[in-house]
């Protein structure tokens, strides 16, 4: 049977609800950050907009969203078209325009580019990067990434004409390596292809220079080099946690990522 986005989202929501009783561990950059994440934080922002990156769609945020909604937050997952950077940024801006007040903007992976560009929106009160790109304004991210060892997932990208995707082997091993195989296979089946043109764009803004920022480094990441993640987090002065996770910490450690977003919402 073909897996549709609706079927997939329904299945993940059910799994998220069942797993709410479990707690995932978090390694923070300092003990205070780890303990503070678990405390109740008064919410100043009631809205959260979440953007997905390459090899995924908006449903990748479902388990995190379930936890945020349980905290009373209004959540919207952007369906990033993965066509060009301006079109992807516009998809985020349209969702931000609809928010009714202060909003936390969250991005995973490639969508850190969108957070960096669209995060200057006046409704955005805080930025959260989850194993995400965080370039400076006008910076060539590809050139920056080349100053670090190439992550294994890069070798698994294949193209059908102008559309790129990850092979199943690379997806399971290098993108979703800490997920149960059955769940990773479902995620592979719904990965959204990206256009080559998407990778040529450069941000013109650096929202992290003017907005408070949080960053979750994935220490076992095989899609973005963890040391590159640490560099970007330090450069932006982000409050940083380290999660022993693959690139998909938002799925393997949804409690941890939700705690980080709630903390940003309380800023």
Residue ranges and their predicted role:
Residues 1-15:
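N-terminal secretory signal peptides and thylakoid transit peptides that target proteins
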Residues 23-44:
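C-terminal segment of N-terminal export signals and the immediately downstream linker at the start
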Residues 74-104, 117-121, 141-146:
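Active-site loop/oxyanion-hole signature of alpha/beta-hydrolase fold enzymes
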Residues 107, 111, 115:
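Gly/Ala-rich beta-loop-alpha elbow adjacent to hydrolase catalytic centers
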Residues 124, 128-161, 195:
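Flexible "cap/lid" loop of the alpha/beta hydrolase fold
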Residues 195-236, 242-245, 250:
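Conserved serine/cysteine hydrolase catalytic core
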Residues 251-263:
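Post-His helix in hydrolase/transferase enzymes
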């Amino acid at each position: 049977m073909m897996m549709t986005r609706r079927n997939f989202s329904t299945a993940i929501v059910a799994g998220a609800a069942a797993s709410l009783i479990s707690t995932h561990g978090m390694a923070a950059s300092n003990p205070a950050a780890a303990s503070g994440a678990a405390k109740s934080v008064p919410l100043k922002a009631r809205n959260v907009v979440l953007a997905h990156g390459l090899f995924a769609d908006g449903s990748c945020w479902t388990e995190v969203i379930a936890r945020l909604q349980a905290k009373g937050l209004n959540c919207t997952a952007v369906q990033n078209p993965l066509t060009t950077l301006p079109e992807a940024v516009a998809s985020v801006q349209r969702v931000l325009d609809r928010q009714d007040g202060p909003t936390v903007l969250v991005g995973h992976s490639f969508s850190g580019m969108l957070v960096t560009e669209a995060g200057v929106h006046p409704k955005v009160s805080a930025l959260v990067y989850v194993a995400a790109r965080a370039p400076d304004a006008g910076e060539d991210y590809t050139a920056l990434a080349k100053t670090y060892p190439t992550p294994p997932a890069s070798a698994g990208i294949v193209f059908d004409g102008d559309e790129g995707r990850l092979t199943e082997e690379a997806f399971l091993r290098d993108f979703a390596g800490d997920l149960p195989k059955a769940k990773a296979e479902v995620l592979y089946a719904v990965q959204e292809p990206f256009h080559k043109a998407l990778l040529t764009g450069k941000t013109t803004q650096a929202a992290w220079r003017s907005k408070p920022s949080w960053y979750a480094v994935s220490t076992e990441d095989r899609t973005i080099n963890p040391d590159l993640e640490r560099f970007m987090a330090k450069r932006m002065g982000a409050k940083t946690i380290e999660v022993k996770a693959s690139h998909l910490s938002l799925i393997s450690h949804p409690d941890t990522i939700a705690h980080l977003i709630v903390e940003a919402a309380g800023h």
